[in-house]
A protein has these predicted regions:
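N-terminal secretory signal peptides that target proteins for export/translocation
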Residues: 1-3
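Bacterial N-terminal signal peptides
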Residues: 9-18
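Sec/Tat signal peptide C-region and signal peptidase I cleavage site
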Residues: 19-23
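Alpha/beta-hydrolase superfamily serine-hydrolase fold, recognizing
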Residues: 27, 31-60, 64, 76, ...
Length: 342
């Protein structure tokens, strides 16, 4: 079992210890498809995490859960960086903590380009180093320098803290290089936040990044969209909106309208957006979030492509670094950004 799969198992166990699972039962079982790699089949075959129906009731309970997640998730990251030959430097931009990940074999063509990574975690999980696995994989496989923004999160810092911090880092990057040399990417919450950054930059009159890659983006924080229902229980990562996920949406929103485009970018005006690449899976709870955003972008005349992985639940493309699907995903992101960044 590789490092990321070990980390995910440890994280799920820790979360179970921190908060007992609810009593809800999941729907029917599903066969594991034989049309995917053995590594992905192993992920698909896993039972859903028992903590999916956890409902922390206080800020301290949310913090306990987040801290447990961070502690376990961070354990394997030094080994992953070593395996992929990725260096790391800690710092800050505009007062926001950042990690800079640089592949040892950074191509000459990418030396003056940079990607901004916004991590997932429902606006409550993934603080510090614990959320950096996607950034490491992108640096190591996609061969770009990646700036990871450690943005503030709920419950201590609800909306608009996350997007404010993302914008602060983006503005700082614009001071060092033109937007045509900057790409933005993220998964889940980070995918949604990448799109929100584009909306916010447009509203502020800032140049938009050269390209955006939004993996299984959380584009609608309300329980709207077919796959919230059809993939409930089929997705063995998020499982259901009615677990901790819906609580996290309301916690971060802090009483604001969940359909505000600064929370749910699928309701925003996407005209003028840069080329955008979206990714999902056939079992992903956020498949409709992704498909709806793809259509919204295309309707606005934006060059937008959509990749849907067979059998994949939410964001499983960065949970097994040796899976062919993972290698394809991050190589494809590298090709996408190479095509659109100057």
């Amino acid at each position: 079992m590789n490092r990321l799969k070990q980390a995910m198992s440890a994280v799920l166990l820790t979360c179970v210890v921190a908060f007992p699972a609810g009593a809800r039962e999941l729907p029917r079982p599903f066969p594991v498809p034989q049309t995917v790699s053995p590594e992905l089949r192993e992920l698909i075959a896993k039972v859903p995490p028992p903590h999916w129906d956890t409902h922390p009731g206080t800020a301290q309970e949310w913090k306990t859960w987040a801290d447990a997640f961070s502690k376990e998730a961070a354990k394997t990251l030094p080994g992953l960086r070593e395996k992929l030959k990725v260096g790391v430097a800690k710092g800050e931009l505009g007062g926001v903590p950042v990690f800079t990940f640089t592949p040892k074999d950074l191509p000459e063509a990418n030396r003056d380009r940079v990607l901004l990574n916004l991590h997932g975690g429902g606006y409550v999980l993934g603080q510090g180093e614990s959320g950096t696995q996607e950034a490491v994989l992108m640096a190591g496989i996609g061969k770009f320098r990646v700036i990871y923004a450690d943005y503030r999160m709920a419950p201590e810092f609800p909306y608009p803290a996350a997007v404010d911090d993302a914008m602060t880092v983006y503005r700082e990057l614009l001071k060092t290089k033109p937007a045509q040399k900057i790409g933005v990417f993220g998964t889940s919450t980070g995918g949604g936040l990448s799109l929100i950054l584009g909306l916010r930059a447009k509203a502020e009159g800032l140049p938009l990044p050269a390209a955006i890659a939004a993996g299984t983006p959380w584009t609608d924080l309300t329980k709207t969209g077919d796959s919230y229902f059809t993939n409930e229980g089929m997705d063995n990562i998020l499982v259901s909106y009615d677990g901790w996920l819906g609580d996290a949406a309301r916690l971060y929103a802090g009483g604001h309208d969940l359909k505000d485009p600064m929370l749910s970018p699928v309701f925003g005006d996407m005209s003028g957006f840069p080329p955008t690449l979206l990714t999902s899976g056939t079992r992903d709870l956020f498949l409709s979030n992704t498909a709806r955003m793809h259509l919204k972008l295309r309707e606005a005349g934006v060059p937008a492509d959509l990749i849907v992985f067979e059998g994949m639940s939410h964001a499983q493309y960065h949970m097994a670094e040796d899976a062919p699907e993972t290698r394809f995903h991050f190589s494809e992101l590298g090709r996408f950004f190479d095509a659109h960044l100057q």
